[in-house]
Amino acid sequence: MQGKTQSISFDGREIRLTTGRFAPQAGGSVLVECGDTAVLVTATRSKGRDGIDFLPLICDYEERLYAAGRIPGSYMRREARPPERATLTCRLIDRPMRPLFPSWMRDDLQVVATCLSLDERVPSDVLAVTGASIATLLAGIPFNGPMAAVRVGLLGDDFVLNPSYREIERGDLDLVVAGTADGVVMVEAGANQLPEGDVIEAIDFGYEAIQELIKAQETLLKDLGIKQVKPEAPKEDTTVPAYLEKQCTKAISAVLSKFEQSKEDRDNGLEAVKADAAEAIAALKEDDAVRQAVSSSSKLLGNSFKALTKKLMRQQILKDGKRVDGRGLDEVRQISAMAGVLPRRVHGSGLFQRGLTQVLSTATLGTPSDAQEMDDLHPNTEKLYLHHYNFPPYSVGETRPMRSPGRREIGHGALAERAILPVLPEKDTFPYVVRVVSEVLSSNGSTSMGSVCGSTLALMDAGVPLKAPVSGAAMGLIKEGKDIKILTDIQGIEDFLGDMDFKVAGSEKGITALQMDMKITGLPVKVMAEAVNQARPARLHILEKMLEAIDKPRETLSPHAPRLLSFRIDPELIGTVIGPGGRTIKGITERTNTKIDIEDSGIVTIASHDGAAAEEAQKIIEGLTRKVNEGEMFSGSITRIIPIGAFVEILPGKEGMIHISQLSEARVEKVEDVVKVGDEVTVRVREIDNRGRINLTLRGVPQSGESTEVEPQPTPVAPLS
């Protein structure tokens, strides 16, 4: 198995590219290695299916737990469906690749990245993105690459290129930028309320680094003697497009310029124009070229009409500065926000509406045991904040089967989750696990940013003490040559017919999340900077409207939310609280009707719907873990009696024993002659033996009731008070 390995020196590290050794039947394959991380990426092309009018591209990212020396924890001990983070990596590969394929391509394309080995110092996702470009070029697929991706972190005041997992966790920025020689094609970022200028600088820093990887790919192709296949659009028959442009331009423009009409009226108006065109074509002579072309292809008329509508709408924006709903380029749609729209049995709820986009978000508070365990390669195995996004078909007036969440739903949910994470309270001050669910009730663009706004409303209604409220806006772009217009708060038709979908979320202080997808082959960082800066006043305007609904987190939780008490104990005493076989902690939970979680760090969290019960459980645990010293005095009750002595509960959950010889100064024949179960006594700690057992005494300790001294002729002793 011969192969060729080439090395790239990149930011002080060595990236190794091995070609010709693995997956010989794939169209193109490359093993990308850095440190001990190794990702095999393949690209394969097969003949397209009939009737396809889109690019059938599939990007998969496969994780194997053997890459980290682990065996899956499932019953079958085999990897099941891809975990959420693997799905997000699939999208991370797909988003910069898709705009670089020619729009006319209809062949089935599949890119598969498999993580074979993982070094925690070198995350695999950006290697997979760069590897996807290399494999595609090696496969000879028409592609406007090379393309590469890097991650940028921020530690203190310094940008870090391709940081480790630990550095990502510690830093204030986690930004992935992908680009070509022409410009940026994809950005994905989470930030700790960073100013716009810092984020733009980070994008520029990453884009400059990408150029080295692009040059390395060009060198690789040259060394292998492979010529890149550049997309060349096939000649299209312009008969139908030319006919529609002549017959329908005026009618379409009239519909698009009715700024006061509703989305439904505009859609119906365009459908009517298309129907008239179809009727006119059907009335043409049978040998007419237009009629014959439409008859030979069921989708030709629809696609040509859609292309003409796109062209006219873009011209209206570029020339007149007017959008289909009459807004200016930097104008936000009408905003409506409400908090507490559902009964308090739902811990928190918020309803956010922007134009025809409406999102209902709910917040649920849970206990530490409700945290999501992540069985994947990522070193962070637990999630304390979860956001789930649902997009039912009725939100766009359609019918289709309701199935489990797809990649889009998972991706949108993760973006809204990322936007909120930086403003969540610290675990020590608010130990709840929080789940937010965003139900998209109506969609006309920017539902993910609507979910961010809805999440903020729901969390504040639930009483979660956010560091700052967060809002979001989606920006768009229309580009024809050097003529560029940036659109604020794009709606569905502008997203579909535009060149960019750029989502920006953040607080008044700065950005918390960023996501940019392009439909063109690259955008200069300078234009991106304009979009980021134009998004800020839009975000703040939306935030102002949200704060009119609820200006701060509620001071009290829902009566149906669990009450949590959190405190710290010595980690070495965790075993004392748990007890042999878990008997001690089980007894505490049964006695107090609470739920108790103990972390390895010693943080104890008690959950209960009754605050008094939680406090009782806390006292018991504190008693179990409190250090007892010789000579200390305690008051407690007799819990049990054995022939050689009596046990006293000196602290909640902690007992000591009074030996029969320590019950009195006089000789005692029978323990019951002095005390019985339930008696309240004051004792002194006589000693703590080498096994940690607490030995107590009554001798010389004044009691609050009758004397414990035994008369020469023993008589029954009254209970001690």
From Swiss-Prot:
Known cofactor(s): Mg(2+)
Cellular localization per UniProt: Cytoplasm
S1 motif domain span: 631-699
Location of region: Disordered: 700-721
Short name of any one Pfam family annotated for the protein: KH_1
Cellular component GO terms held in the UniProt record: cytosol
Reaction catalyzed: RNA(n+1) + phosphate = RNA(n) + a ribonucleoside 5'-diphosphate
GO terms for MF: 3'-5'-RNA exonuclease activity; magnesium ion binding; polyribonucleotide nucleotidyltransferase activity; RNA binding
SUPFAM superfamilies documented for this protein: Eukaryotic type KH-domain (KH-domain type I), Nucleic acid-binding proteins, Ribonuclease PH domain 2-like, Ribosomal protein S5 domain 2-like
Binding, Mg(2+): D495, D501
Keywords: Cytoplasm, Magnesium, Metal-binding, Nucleotidyltransferase, RNA-binding, Transferase
BP-aspect Gene Ontology terms: mRNA catabolic process; RNA processing
EC number from the UniProt entry: 2.7.7.8
Membrane keyword on record: no
Domain of life of the organism encoding this protein: Bacteria
Protein family per UniProt: Belongs to the polyribonucleotide nucleotidyltransferase family.
The protein's name: Polyribonucleotide nucleotidyltransferase
